[in-house]
């Protein structure tokens, strides 16, 4: 069905779309990582199937603070990197304000990966893993409301969290969800503690802060880490520390294969791991020992990869 533009009672401009079934990458600010495929997987100026709006029109509408209502189900990667001012598309590489995405049905996996601002409302079910988001108390009857972890920690909470504890400088998550990209683009001296496993790219593009996972992590943990500390109190899948730039990645277990691939800086401390050039194993420094002890870990169990 065709989409149309209208207004809600709060005077926010609204686009309504009713796609042909669950469509992936609606409101995806990366257009399914466009720089990797140059339009072969998703053309930003292609119409969303069954609607009169393109993927780009939806993203630009959200950048302007508007609302997008999906009349039906949504596919994978809804609102990916929402609020990221991506340098590849001419942005400054930081964070911008974003609008609202509302889904009248269910949402498939990886909703809100690397999301840094904006709000998502969902009437139906949401499949794990989810992204860098938590549920907060909803102000719309019949809808669940989700906000960015990074946004809350950097700009303050504007709603009561669900199964999440907030203390000064700390967020403790224990809601049973598996997450991708936890702590994405975090740039504040705060701590995130996540009880349970996480999946892809924990701490991606972090600059400051600490993310501590009380469980195992998936691939690409610490990818593009640019500062701060990521602590995994368990094992990681492969490619930990890929393209890492700065900071510490600490794995209290096995950091996996292809450790530190394309690493430009930073330090990986792990009990075990199989590095690839330019990363290699070396002795712990005094700074490494101090960091491990401050994290409550035993330095003699760890190896340095840098």
UniProtKB/Swiss-Prot annotation:
What molecular function does GO assign, one term? oxidoreductase activity
- Bilayer-crossing residues are none
Supply the InterPro entries for this chain: Glu_synth_asu_C_sf
Which CDD domains would you find in this protein's record? GXGXG
Q: Which family does it belong to?
A: To M.jannaschii MJ0658.
Q: What is this protein called?
A: Uncharacterized protein MTH_238
């Amino acid at each position: 069905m065709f989409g149309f533009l209208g207004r809600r009672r709060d005077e926010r401009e609204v686009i309504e779309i009713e796609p042909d079934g669950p469509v992936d990458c609606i409101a995806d600010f990366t257009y399914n990582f466009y720089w990797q495929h140059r339009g072969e997987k998703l053309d930003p100026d292609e119409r969303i199937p069954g609607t009169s709006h393109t993927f780009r029109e939806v993203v630009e509408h959200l950048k302007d603070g508007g609302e997008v209502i999906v009349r039906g189900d949504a596919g994978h990667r809804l609102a990916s990197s929402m609020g990221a001012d991506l340098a590849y598309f001419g942005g400054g590489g930081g964070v911008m304000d974003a609008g609202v995405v509302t889904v009248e049905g269910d949402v498939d996996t990886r909703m809100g990966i690397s999301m840094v601002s904006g709000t998502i409302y969902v009437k139906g079910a949401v499949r794990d893993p989810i992204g860098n988001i938590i549920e907060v108390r909803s102000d719309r009857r019949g809808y669940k409301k989700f906000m960015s972890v990074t946004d809350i920690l950097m700009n303050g909470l504007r709603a009561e969290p669900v199964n999440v504890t907030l203390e000064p400088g700390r967020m403790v998550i224990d809601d049973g969800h598996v997450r991708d990209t936890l702590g994405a683009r975090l740039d504040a001296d705060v701590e995130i503690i996540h009880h349970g496993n996480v999946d892809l790219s924990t701490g991606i593009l972090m600059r400051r802060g600490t993310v501590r996972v009380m469980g195992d992590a998936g691939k690409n943990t610490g990818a593009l880490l640019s500062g701060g500390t990521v602590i995994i109190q368990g094992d990681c899948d492969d490619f930990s520390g890929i393209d890492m730039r700065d900071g510490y990645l600490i794995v209290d277990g096995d950091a996996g294969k292809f450790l530190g691939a394309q690493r430009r800086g930073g330090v990986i401390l792990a009990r075990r791991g199989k590095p690839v050039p330019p990363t290699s194993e070396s002795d712990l420094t005094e700074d490494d020992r101090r960091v491990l002890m401050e994290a409550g870990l035993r330095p003699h169990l760890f190896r340095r990869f840098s």
